[in-house]
Swiss-Prot record:
Changing residue 86 to G: In HMAHCHD; results in high molecular weight protein aggregates; severely decreased function in homocysteine synthesis; affects nuclear-cytoplasmic protein distribution resulting in slightly decreased protein amount in the nucleus. It holds the Pfam family AdoHcyase. This is Adenosylhomocysteinase. Catalyzes the hydrolysis of S-adenosyl-L-homocysteine to form adenosine and homocysteine. Binds copper ions. It is an enzyme of class 3 (hydrolase). InterPro entries: Adenosylhomocyst_ase-like_sf (IPR042172), Adenosylhomocysteinase-like (IPR000043), Ado_hCys_hydrolase_NAD-bd (IPR015878), NAD(P)-bd_dom_sf (IPR036291), S-Ado-L-homoCys_hydrolase_CS (IPR020082). Changing residue 328 to D: In HMAHCHD; reduced tetramerization; affects nuclear-cytoplasmic protein distribution resulting in increased protein amount in the nucleus.
């Protein structure tokens, strides 16, 4: 691998801009800054060779530099062909950290980028930090000889976690993994509050559409769907939910949303957002019944929720309006506006989640990497969670920035509740 490129980004000349953006983001990411303060001297990740496959954004750049500060060697690729922020990638490359990512990769380039992160100067990767499971799957299928040397996987997102559990059930998973997604300070913050802000940002930047007065259809009412529905309602849209789960459907109904099927909702909606992580949510028969210039987008991890293939094969005309905005004319004369080719709209058409909420998620990632690297005996092959105490520590690290003052339990109160004054304050099954 001696002839490997030290990095490949769109434009290394963007590094100075990227560095300015990182400086601002650091001030909004108190959890990661706390990790640096606490562990920069002890370097708990010394010896770790972390291959990361996660959206190469400004926030991710702060995560990468935190991992390096804690002693790790790091090589990086993005987990989505459109999600890289080129100035952030340039800043990381300029800092001497191998990164292989640019906005607008082809599928072939995407795979090439991931493969560049597998071998370091001192040997192959020994840790995985993944978002969506593409790196994990690639190692298990194409590079199984590397598996014995890998100490652990930390997985960022719902789709990747589903993949891990599926692999475990089928006896395919060969490496211990920590499910970062289902840490409370990830799923109840990044998935909900992050999407609540970044969805609208993506739709607005792509289309400049007025949301007030429109009918918005949100497929799925998990944490991501909840955040999207709140945002659209907040901007004045009438929101319709589609759901498979009776509990989530009841939650949506109790919040005042109409809940129906996509076969019915497709005739009413002006804006469609898929959030499910499942295949075949919006199909050809739905497109054919949509209103003229219906806006269709996805905020789930992969591009499988919207049948983009059907659009490309059946539309009479496809006009590219601007990057990641395409207008299809159907045989019935009506048009469909598709954002980000059915991939993540908030990263394809905007800048993704704000730095503060990503600090929650990425502090969990750092803790997961430290746990797996320093305590391998605690984590046999399987899918694990971070301890509740660490989840609470992530939240606590972010309170000062918001000027939050916690009430402290007295010894008498703690004894009455049967817990320590310092937590954990909830049982593992508590849902928040």
């Amino acid at each position: 691998m001696s002839d490997k490129l030290p990095y490949k980004v769109a434009d290394i000349g963007l590094a100075a801009w990227g560095r300015k953006a990182l400086d601002i983001a650091e001030n909004e990411m108190p959890g990661l800054m706390r990790m640096r303060e606490r562990y920069s001297a002890s370097k708990p990740l010394k010896g770790a060779r972390i291959a990361g496959c996660l959206h190469m954004t400004v926030e991710t750049a702060v995560l990468i530099e935190t991992l390096v500060t804690l002693g790790a060697e790091v090589q990086w690729s993005s987990c989505n062909i459109f999600s890289t922020q080129d100035h952030a990638a340039a800043a990381i490359a300029k800092a001497g950290i191998p990164v292989y990512a640019w906005k607008g990769e082809t599928d072939e380039e995407y795979l090439w980028c991931i493969e560049q992160t597998l071998y370091f100067k001192d040997g192959p990767l020994n840790m995985i930090l993944d978002d969506g499971g593409d790196l994990t799957n690639l190692i298990h299928t194409k590079y199984p000889q590397l598996l014995p040397g890998i100490r652990g996987i930390s997985e960022e997102t719902t789709t990747g976690v589903h993949n891990l559990y599926k692999m475990m059930a089928n006896g395919i998973l060969k490496v211990p993994a920590i499910n970062v997604n289902d840490s409370v300070t990830k799923s109840k913050f990044d998935n909900l509050y992050g999407c609540r802000e970044s969805l609208i940002d993506g739709i607005k930047r792509a289309t400049d559409v007025m949301i007030a007065g429109k009918v918005a259809v949100v497929a799925g009412y998990g944490d991501v769907g909840k955040g999207c529905a709140q945002a659209l309602r907040g901007f004045g849209a009438r929101v319709i939910i589609t759901e498979i789960d009776p509990i989530n459907a009841l939650q949506a109904a109790m919040e005042g949303y109409e809940v129906t099927t996509m076969d019915e909702a497709c005739q009413e909606g002006n804006i469609f957002v898929t959030t499910t992580g499942c295949i075949d949510i919006i199909l050809g028969r739905h497109f054919e019944q949509m209103k003229d210039d219906a806006i269709v987008c996805n905020i789930g991890h992969f591009d499988v929720e919207i049948d983009v293939k059907w659009l490309n094969e059946n539309a009479v005309e496809k006009v590219n309006i601007k990057p990641q905005v395409d207008r299809y004319r159907l045989k019935n004369g009506r048009r469909i506006i598709l954002l980000a080719e059915g991939r993540l709209v908030n990263l394809g058409c905007a800048m993704g989640h704000p730095s503060f909420v990503m600090s929650n998620s990425f502090t969990n990632q750092v803790m997961a990497q430290i746990e797996l690297w320093t305590h391998p005996d605690k984590y046999p092959v399987g899918v694990h969670f971070l301890p509740k105490k660490l989840d609470e520590a992530v939240a606590e690290a972010h309170l000062g920035k918001l000027n939050v003052k916690l009430t402290k339990l007295t010894e008498k109160q703690a004894q009455y509740l049967g817990m320590s004054c310092d937590g954990p304050f909830k049982p593992d099954h508590y849902r928040y």
